[in-house]
Design a protein with these regions (language model features):
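Active-site mouth loops of central-metabolism enzymes
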Residues: 11-21, 73-86, 122-123, 149-162
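Hydrophobic faces of well-ordered beta-strands that scaffold small-molecule active sites
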Residues: 12-15, 44-46, 74-78, 100-102, ...
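Alpha/beta enzyme core
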Residues: 35-39, 87-118, 122, 126-210
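Short, solvent-exposed helix-helix connector turns and helix-capping sites enriched
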Residues: 57-61, 125, 179, 244, ...
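Alpha/beta catalytic cores of nucleotide-metabolism and tRNA/nucleoside-modifying enzymes
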Residues: 1-8, 12-13, 18, 24, ...
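Active-site beta-loop-alpha junctions enriched in small/polar residues
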Residues: 17-19, 49-51, 79-81, 107-109, ...
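Glycine-rich, positively charged N-terminal anion/phosphate-binding segment
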Residues: 2, 17-96
Length: 379
């Protein structure tokens, strides 16, 4: 897949997920893909970075922009609502050589974001959305750094925006667009509507801007099926990789026509869990690593017959030594997980999208929403 001047051996992208796709997880995914297939071939995108917090050099935000030496190309996603901060943040990325690819987030459906006019609420305001994309592209002028854009089908079924969002992004110079095939109202519930990806692909015909599909990819076969059904040029995977960092090796192999690596045994997963914790400790210290790995162990052990007491003990680890001792008890297990490629992560149910008062009155309004920048929490 080609995005601007970036060419990858696999059309697979790791979707940014807060609290998950930090440097340790990205490095782990790359290591496993390299080990199983001989290449680290896709794009691994960092956690969403708030443009304003970056411009203000918030300490936590700047730490989140850290990339490992092995990460090439370095891929960063920005959350922004204001063309001014967008331009300044992207210029900062360019001038300080922070990343090689910039993705713009217009897909977040979280109520605390949309009720202020951010995230998946933005594409409804066509001019504002276009101004933001234009600012990002302008800030990369004279470089090889491509700007890509991610959005949803729309706010709800009465307010679809993805076709306009794709065309506007192309007109403003975006190098690719990605569609999460759900509305903001759906959040993560129900099934992704791949037919809308196909509609966007058709709508973008003639622009030379590739379309990346996102939604309900939990197994290697899913990615191949999405690309065949929709004609999309690449796939983006989020929740499917929770506790399954080897999924990228499987996806890449499937799409290249190679033998797909099998699901790992419980013993192999134990070694992956420890490596993940080790990378977390190197990045953020052992105390933080032992707290952070707890949520991951629930995902890693899904479908394995390990029992509630073992899971409870893992959730209480306070040192890498303690974690290693627990994992040693399952290190020789050849058990395989049941239903390993079932849906995982957030699902919930659809709900009305929280929006600022009068937000839907004028889709051409380009006023920057007040207070829509997420607080400086690194989000």
């Amino acid at each position: 897949m080609r995005i601007g001047e970036i060419e990858t051996n696999s059309p697979v992208i790791l979707a940014p997920m807060a609290g998950v796709t930090n440097m340790p997880f990205r490095v782990l995914c790359r290591e496993i893909e390299q080990e199983l297939t001989g290449t680290a071939s896709g794009l691994y995108v960092c956690e969403m970075i708030t443009a304003r917090a970056m411009v203000e050099r918030n300490e936590k935000t700047m730490h989140m922009t850290t990339f490992a030496d092995v990460e090439r190309p370095r891929s960063m996603q920005l959350y922004t609502v204001d063309p001014k901060y967008t331009y300044e943040a992207v210029r900062m990325i360019v001038d300080e050589d922070i990343a090689d690819h910039i993705d713009m987030n217009f897909g977040c459906p979280v109520p605390k974001v949309t009720r202020r006019g951010g995230g998946s609420a933005i594409p409804y305001k066509r001019r504002l959305y276009g101004n933001i994309v234009r600012a990002a592209v302008a800030a990369t002028e004279g470089t090889d750094i491509p700007v890509t854009v991610k959005f949803r089908i729309g706010i709800d079924d009465d307010h679809h925006t993805h076709l306009d969002a794709g065309r506007i992004a192309a007109e403003e110079g975006a190098a690719a667009v990605a569609l999460h095939a759900r509305t903001a109202a759906q959040r993560y519930s129900g099934s992704a509507r791949w037919d809308e990806i196909a509609r966007l692909v058709e709508h973008m015909d003639g622009t030379d801007v590739p379309v990346i599909g996102n939604g309900d990819i939990f197994a290697a076969e899913d990615a191949a099926r999405m690309m065949a059904q929709t004609g999309c040029h690449g796939v983006e995977v989020g929740r499917g990789c929770l506790g399954r960092p080897w999924l990228f090796a499987q996806l890449g192999a499937q799409l290249r026509g190679e033998d797909v690596p099998p699901e790992p045994t419980l013993g192999q997963v134990a070694r992956i869990i420890y490596r993940h914790a080790e990378l977390l400790a190197q990045h953020d210290g052992e105390d933080h690593a032992c707290r952070d790995i707890r949520k991951h162990t629930g995902w890693y052990l899904r479908g394995f017959p390990v029992g509630g007491e073992f899971r409870k003990q893992l959730a209480q680890v306070t040192s890498l030594t303690q974690l290693q001792a627990l994992l040693d008890t399952i290190a020789d297990s050849t058990e395989l997980a049941d239903n390993a490629d079932d849906a995982r992560g957030r699902q919930g149910s659809p709900s009305k999208v929280a929006l600022p008062e009068g937000w839907l009155d004028d889709p051409e309004d380009e006023t920057v929403p007040e207070g829509a920048e997420i607080e400086n929490n690194g989000g």
